[in-house]
């Protein structure tokens, strides 16, 4: 099972510092949270131009979690930044084929995310259309929330119904629940506050 450190910040200077730390952990990926304050209650960093300038200097691959109201309107700019994977929310999609076509043309992997109140069944129609699913086990946007235990069943259902998918789980991940989430069927755990709020972020990453 893979662990991807998540970076949930409003300031790009802090993002740059944390990406370099993620590289020092030995992780192959970093997960950047983007929030527009419309789909979410809070606003996070959301400037693709800044990422475009810096990403080519980084050794880690970048995936972006796009928590925005209208992903179709902004996706194109993010696809120019050098990222390798982008998650858009099931709840905000208006034209899936447009998103898929744009990502395909740019060579960027498209994944689908769902918030905690959306049942796994919402993703069944995308079986075979995307390879990555992100189960957000907390409310979108704000770091430091507790994992909602009812999401374990959602992971199990998705794993059973779409066995070939890659399932990422994000939100409230820590050393106490990581094993149960893995057993439920997760392939990748995304962790932010557990890693960054510890006294030793590298050690916290390695413990997961």
What are these regions (language model features)?
Residues 38-71, 75-76, 178-196:
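A short alpha/beta connector and helix-capping loop motif
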Residues 2-7, 30-32, 62-66, 86-88, ...:
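Hydrophobic faces of well-ordered beta-strands that scaffold small-molecule active sites
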Residues 86-94, 134-143, 184-205:
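Glycine-rich phosphate-binding active-site loops on the catalytic face of alpha/beta enzymes
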Residues 22, 32-33, 78, 133, ...:
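Conserved, mostly hydrophobic/aromatic
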Residues 15-22, 70-80, 117-128, 173-189:
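Catalytic cores of alpha/beta
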Residues 139, 146-188, 194:
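Active-site/ligand-binding-proximal alpha/beta "capping" segment
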Residues 50-62, 101-105, 125-129:
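Short, basic, low-complexity termini and linkers enriched in Ser/Thr/Gly/Pro
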Residues 37-48, 116, 123-156, 160-162, ...:
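Glycine/Thr-rich beta-alpha phosphate-binding loop at enzyme active sites
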């Amino acid at each position: 099972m893979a662990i991807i450190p998540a970076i949930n910040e409003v300031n790009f200077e802090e993002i740059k510092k944390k990406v370099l730390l993620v590289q020092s952990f030995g992780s192959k990926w970093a997960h950047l949270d983007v929030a527009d304050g419309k789909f979410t209650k809070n606003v996070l960093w959301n400037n693709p131009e800044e990422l475009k300038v810096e990403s080519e200097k980084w050794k880690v691959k970048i995936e972006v979690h796009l928590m925005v109201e209208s992903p179709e309107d902004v996706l194109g700019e993010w696809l120019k930044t050098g990222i390798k994977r982008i998650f858009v929310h099931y709840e905000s999609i208006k034209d899936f084929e447009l998103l898929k076509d744009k990502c395909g043309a740019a060579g960027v992997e498209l994944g689908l995310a769902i918030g905690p109140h959306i049942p796994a069944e919402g993703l069944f129609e995308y079986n075979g259309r995307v390879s990555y699913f992100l189960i957000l086990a907390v409310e979108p946007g704000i770091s430091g929330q507790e994992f909602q235990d009812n999401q374990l069943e959602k992971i199990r259902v998705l794993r059973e119904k779409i066995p070939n998918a890659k399932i990422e789980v994000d939100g409230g991940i820590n050393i106490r629940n990581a094993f149960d989430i893995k057993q439920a069927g997760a392939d990748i755990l995304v962790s932010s506050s557990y890693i960054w709020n510890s006294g030793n972020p590298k050690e916290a990453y390695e413990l997961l």
